[in-house]
Amino acid sequence: TTINPSDDAPAEEKPIEELVTNAAFNSKTATGTSDYEFRFTANCDGVLSIWDSEDNAIATDVAVAANTVVKPATTTLNVGKNSFRYVFTPDAGYIPEKDMVMSSYEPIEGTFTVTYRTYGVEGQSIYVAPGKYGVGTKEDPMSIYDAVKYVQPGQTIVVMEGTYYLDKTVKVERGVNGTADKPIQMVADTDASSRPVFDFQGLCAGMVLAGDYWYFQGFDVTNSANAQKGIQLSGKYNTMDNIMTYHNGNTGLQVSRYLTTDEFDMWPAYNLILNCTSYGNADAGYEDADGFAAKLTVGDGNVFDGCISYNNADDGWDLFAKVQSGSIGAVTIKNSVAYGNGYLEDGTDAGNGNGFKLGGDSMSGKHVLENCVAFDNKAKGIDSNSCPDIKIKNSTSIDNESYNVALYTKTAENTDYEATGIISYRTGFDSDTVARTAGLNVKEDLEPKGTQDIKKIYKTTNYFWDTASKTSVNSEGATVSTDWFKSLDYSAILDGVKSVGTITRNADGTIALGDVFALTDKAPAGVGADFSHDKLTASVSPVIGESVATGDTSNIAFLLALFLMSGAAIAAVCIYDRKRRIVK
């Protein structure tokens, strides 16, 4: 049947969707410093005004842009609870998207409370212990939850030994910062005989660390809830030193942004993850749990140095980026080892299992992999994962089940890979010393595109696996021989069910690979990874100040001030009374 268009029913207009109006403070609610900066976000444009408890204006009609963190004012806090009142008024004409309006343009009124409290002074140490709720002295330690709220720049949180059975996330809120000269330390008790363990009992995310200039050292994080990370590092200029993350419900230690509204300038940057180990992390679906990750929302200057990642459900390292959030900052991984990923410790066949996965969505990253070893991973050893411009220096990739080295992209028109000193090798044996003929027939995946200078990939210092000759060959036809290595027997590291064996650490935290994959004088200079002790970065021995002596010193200061004021008032009354008598 043919219908004349003039007889059609009138076109229906697309319904207008309403977006619920949201506005809230996202600055810290507890602090150990009196100087305070407000942070506020809303999902629409508008203006914000703030008043203190005595109705003194702190901020008046400060412009707020939608989905942007605004810093409307600073103030000086009083000891104890500080209450503030605010009014946010949405712009009446604000349209969030086409065919969409805000659910309400009426002013939003609310209150916001910040607690200011101090324990001790700069240079002193606050002690925490399992199940304790004291005042932070060594004899009467406090909870880890209170310590991370009220610690001051230049102080140390000393984590006493034992297992901390925790039921909520340990969160260092944004704004709880040290400084470059006065960092905040959170370190294991150097007098203890065992490492402290934060066990989250499968109930929640582990630690979310959004402060700047912190130094974390010497503790373990385990058993976060399914799909929740062990540690999320979201601040800047922090160091994670000798931290172990294992058996968490998602990635062991991940660098990524704190809030979904954070733009690139707020993404975590210039953090050092030093001599840390991450293993056995697995989500229920075996899809997301990596050992380490710096992905999706990562700023510049983040470095992994001296880390070990093994037997994680997904990848050893994941530097994934995607088009929706854009490129991430360049990440450096050096002096590190990835093995056995994609299999759990009991041999369970889990997720993807790449050793070092260095990109995503064909986004530029310029990530650097230097002096690293990847072996016996379920999938690829070194994987660009479509990133078109990674740099690999002096690294060894051995006996990975898929490609030892994969440099490829998908949608990028040009690549700019740089590779120097690569040894890709296959022993022909798996961890059970059974011939692995399939592995010998897995070539590299090297796919330069467009303007790529192939001399940056194929050169005399790079030895890639050749399936025809069953050996590793450089650009001039020279080959790798077994006498280049002191040992290719890593069976002492892996047992029959792929659990950890004997990768140990030296007393200073550096990796002790021993003779495994170490090169002899038969190998040419400038190739492969070198884990000689002098090439590695040692951990730092923390300086722990004296214990805080009196607990909440802010209350003491307040009482002292009242005492002095009272004394002055009494003295004034006495003087007045004396003068009155003299006059009489």
Predicted regions and their residues:
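Acidic, glycine- and Ser/Thr-rich low-complexity intrinsically disordered tracts
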Residues: S27, D55, A412-V543
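Acidic Gly/Asp/Thr-rich repetitive segments characteristic of extracellular carbohydrate-active
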Residues: G123-L166
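All-beta strand scaffolds that present successive hydrophobic residues in beta-strands
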Residues: V159, M186, W214-G218, N238-D241, ...
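Short glycine/acidic-rich loop motifs that flank beta-strands on beta-rich extracellular proteins
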Residues: D167-V170, F200-L209, S224-L233, G249-V255, ...
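Right-handed parallel beta-helix/beta-spiral solenoid domain characteristic of secreted/periplasmic
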Residues: N177-K229, A282
